[in-house]
């Protein structure tokens, strides 16, 4: 039996609000009430891993183009086959302050979805073992979790998506947005990467990927945990749970802005690490 995970740091000022089917409407109402004052949205997902890789037959002679097209084809194949398990959202203002939702604590959200069934659905074994070790109860998700279609309906009306005043903050986020786009559109991901980015620009007009931003920062390297450590950001909650990861993403982004960037970051928006937006690369956006 694996040992129960230990949060890296307890913080009595933070409440990770667990969202299940019974309280979905209530929690989405709180998010809708908060979004205007806290327009930075950090997002992370947990999903059943990567179960296949594709072989590209694209004759494109540009090896750089082949690289991101292959990455998208692999992402698309996996997202279309698999089901989202958990999604974390952290809302903040530009200084990193979080909503309190009428309590004496700062609130972040962790949505637990019901669709994935470990008995009948495909998954990567190492990913599921890691999620179990991170205290994600897949059976409880199955029984009590959020209905993904209802979540998508509520998110569409919340002001969080389709809103160019919202700044999405993520880390190496192609799969995160792939799963969210599949939920919001109710369809499989589009065949072509250019159509994927058309959907991205519609639903999430402003997106910052920390992994992409690292390329403009000195002496930053590694994954999210390492970057957070280098910037002096400590985790609250359990690693590999989406709520905790979304908060770590938000706080790391705030520190990066403070240390490495001045003024607007909009020129860095829309680039996802490993899935370079062909419209931005050719200067054809808008």
Swiss-Prot record:
Cofactor: a divalent metal cation
PTM sites of type N-acetylserine: 2
EC number in record: 3.1.13.4
Catalyzed reactions per annotation: Exonucleolytic cleavage of poly(A) to 5'-AMP
Enzyme class: hydrolase
Binding site for a divalent metal cation: 44, 46, 176, 245
GO molecular function, one term: metal ion binding
Location, primary (coarse class): nucleus
Similarity-based family: Belongs to the CAF1 family.
Name of the protein described by the UniProt record: Probable CCR4-associated factor 1 homolog 2
Species of origin: Arabidopsis thaliana
Gene coding for it: CAF1-2
